[in-house]
């Protein structure tokens, strides 16, 4: 152990002395190159032994070091968009020795988090929030009058969101002092800008100039002034389609593009930009996964990884014979599209996570990835439905909330047949409070015309997707992250709308389960000799079944992996009270708190949503079971 420790001390001789950016700024500039080498090696070593977001952090090593070297953080505000690229930031802001605990229970938060460090000025997790927040901070800094600077780092797809452009439009209008660093790692803006550049190049090379060179070369040589005009025109067209033109039209001073892996160059540029007034854009070109060849070749596959062997260089696949809910959705989607050419699948930049890879390859004409644009995705689906198609929006629960008005205004009011396949519902786990999906039942249940289904296993998920797809109005199927339980698949059939199933008959109490906690509920039902009902539908409820349960039992227990407030249990409460049914009801779910990170099992246990916790909650509530 001592030999290993000594080797690490030699290996990271500069990094081990950097416990905060103040110590970083004491380094001679020439040593920054060596620090970046050590930081990259340390990040590779730590993530390979602990898991976490990987490729994005490797791409911003030099940028992170340069920003903290030039800016007086934490007095100057450094804001990271999304935050999965912030591991290097955490390492050099006092959390180096804790980095292996990231995303684990009681460990470092997976993203910048205000409660964790004074250097994390904005808690993040969702994309495209940084520019709006940074603009607000810059206005505050101007009113404060102490010379505070504000920097926003955005990229990795976040710039494609409408919110980012809304903020830039505002910033360019009010001319506030703000630096936006566009981290162009070829996974975000580069394709869009590249397409425009390709268009302009084709326009010039294939239409105007070949014709002139072939048929008018002599004329051009005889009329130098005309030749000069053509050259000016070519430059203007190229400028029109460049990032510089785009950002300058929004009111920003544009600098770049520059090599984002040259820490000395970045330091020199940032030193000048720190003194520059008004809204500024620094465009840097980086490579996601830089410094680890397998991640450079496959940045998507290496975006977030479990523990892995550095020498093998292959992201390990989880050994599990069971299917994930995402893959089950993807298989159902392919099977349905084979029979119905009207099916259209839509995802806001979550092709891999939502299980759409195979579908996108098999049915490219029925597949749309709209980028990080949840609002657009939903209203786009509305338009398709009006046009006679059958759209399915595949989206994470936590991201669907970004399109709430569109669900109401563009889908529900018009009773359009759009199916929402809501992945990562309930407890998600290691990505923390920004990614837990436990609000959707509450915010969807209050919307008129909405059908909401909560499958308890993977076969139920298939049946509910099939049922939702047949509806003439909006419907939602919410399912969790992770694997099913291994049940056999039945033939697809349409589930009777709003009908639950009694799985076990007991005495005194009835447990009404909504969703994937059915296994835990079944264990408790057997131990307490309780009736167990798989309610299946949150909306509409099985009213007749509820009346029967209320009249034949002394108490009802509702169980759901959603916040208690406004959720499925609240729907039961409302029904019981409205119908004057004299039976007490205990709602078990997620309390009125945001839930931190940890494994799904750990989080459920801490919330009392495992079988032990559920039984304890029930026994504490029911006097006759004490």
Curated annotation (Swiss-Prot):
Cofactor list: Mg(2+); thiamine diphosphate
Pathway: Metabolic intermediate biosynthesis; 1-deoxy-D-xylulose 5-phosphate biosynthesis; 1-deoxy-D-xylulose 5-phosphate from D-glyceraldehyde 3-phosphate and pyruvate: step 1/1
Main EC class the enzyme belongs to: transferase
InterPro entries for the chain: Dxylulose-5-P_synthase, THDP-binding, Transketo_C/PFOR_II, Transketolase-like_Pyr-bd, Transketolase_C, Transketolase_CS
Cross-referenced CDD domains: TPP_DXS, TPP_PYR_DXS_TK_like
UniProt xrefs under SUPFAM superfamilies: Thiamin diphosphate-binding fold (THDP-binding), TK C-terminal domain-like
Pfam family, one: DXP_synthase_N
Keywords per UniProt: Isoprene biosynthesis, Magnesium, Metal-binding, Thiamine biosynthesis, Thiamine pyrophosphate, Transferase
GO biological processes: 1-deoxy-D-xylulose 5-phosphate biosynthetic process; isopentenyl diphosphate biosynthetic process, methylerythritol 4-phosphate pathway; terpenoid biosynthetic process; thiamine biosynthetic process
Cited function: Catalyzes the acyloin condensation reaction between C atoms 2 and 3 of pyruvate and glyceraldehyde 3-phosphate to yield 1-deoxy-D-xylulose-5-phosphate (DXP).
Protein family according to the UniProt entry: Belongs to the transketolase family. DXPS subfamily.
Name of the protein in question: 1-deoxy-D-xylulose-5-phosphate synthase
Source organism per UniProt: Wigglesworthia glossinidia brevipalpis
